[in-house]
Design a protein with these regions (language model features):
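Short linear motifs at protein or domain termini
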Residues: 1-115, 119, 253-258
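Short helix-coil transition/hinge motifs at the ends and kinks of transmembrane helices
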Residues: 90-92, 185-193, 242
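Short, 15-30-residue, compositionally biased linear elements
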Residues: 14-15, 193-199
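Conserved amphipathic alpha-helical segments that form helical-bundle/coiled-coil interaction surfaces
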Residues: 105-183, 199-202, 207, 216-230, ...
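C-terminal effector-binding regulatory domain of bacterial HTH transcription factors
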Residues: 2-4, 215-258
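Well-ordered alpha/beta subsegment
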Residues: 210-211
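Short coil/turn linker motifs that delimit alpha-helical repeat modules in TPR/alpha-solenoid proteins
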Residues: 102, 141, 193-194
Length: 258
């Protein structure tokens, strides 16, 4: 099976390569909705990659609503790639959007999601946020990719208990992960200090969630994404004809309070 799967891998980021291989495996091996994929370790062995890369690929497919990872049970197919229209990883107009346009959309969406989540979060939701934050800490120590970052933002959306808001969040992250300019910028974020600062932002957001303070949660999320934007501005090539940093400026955080 390994040679058949490996031939589908193209020149992308490792987790995207594995995700593409898994999509093709689902199509070519006639899997059906409800079928179970091989376990994480077996996939890693088949593709000769680390389990961390496989885990990131599975998160990507979860964001696309193709699979569901059930703790203690396995990886299940919930939709077939060829059955779904407008899959986020397929070429679309949104992939032509610049990273700052995406960030502006995320600020508007996620700050309001955080505000609402602070009023709805259960003890289990808070536990999920804590777990994602701990994963971020672990990844920072080992230098792994930012799986915990995605999990933290998704845990906040899930705390709203509104499936549409969760889906909007999933789609925005899928667009982010497949946006060419975002990926280009992301490769320049080698300094761990940025990630430490963003993790500190997440701690502030979590504190607001625990206190059930919607205004503080909204402000903290807005400021977090503003900090991400400022980091990307520092790393951007302003002479790039596709640079959109000054076209999608955000409101100062003090205006968000009003």
């Amino acid at each position: 099976m390994a040679p058949q799967m490996t031939q589908f891998i193209e020149s992308k980021r490792p987790y995207q390569e594995v995700g593409h291989a898994l999509r093709q495996m689902i199509i070519n091996m006639d899997f059906a909705v409800g079928d179970k994929l091989p376990p994480e370790r077996e996939i890693a062995d088949m593709l000769s990659v680390s389990r961390t890369v496989v885990r990131e690929a599975l998160i990507m497919l979860e964001l696309e609503n193709l699979i569901e990872v059930r703790k203690g049970s396995g990886i299940y197919i919930v939709a077939l790639p060829h059955q779904r229209e407008n899959v986020a990883t397929e070429p679309c107009a949104l992939n032509a959007a610049g990273p700052f346009e995406l960030l502006q959309a995320r600020q508007l969406l996620e700050s309001n999601i955080a505000e609402f989540a602070a009023t709805q979060a259960t003890p289990l939701d808070i536990a999920n946020m804590r777990s994602a934050l701990q994963r971020e800490r672990d990844e920072l120590k080992t230098g792994e990719d930012e799986t915990g970052d995605r999990e933290f933002h998704l845990a906040i959306a899930e705390a709203t208990h509104n499936s549409m808001l969760v889906e909007l969040l999933r789609q925005s992250w899928a667009w982010r992960e497949n946006n060419p300019m975002w990926l280009k910028l992301h490769t320049r974020i080698a300094d761990k200090e940025y990630r430490k600062e963003w993790m500190t932002d997440h701690q502030v957001i979590l504190a607001a969630m625990i206190k059930k303070d919607p205004a503080a949660a909204k402000e903290a999320m807005w400021q977090h994404l503003e900090n991400v934007k400022q980091c990307l501005l520092e790393l951007s090539d302003v002479d790039d004809p596709n640079f959109d940093g000054y076209l999608f400026n955000s409101y100062p955080v003090d205006l968000v309070r009003n």
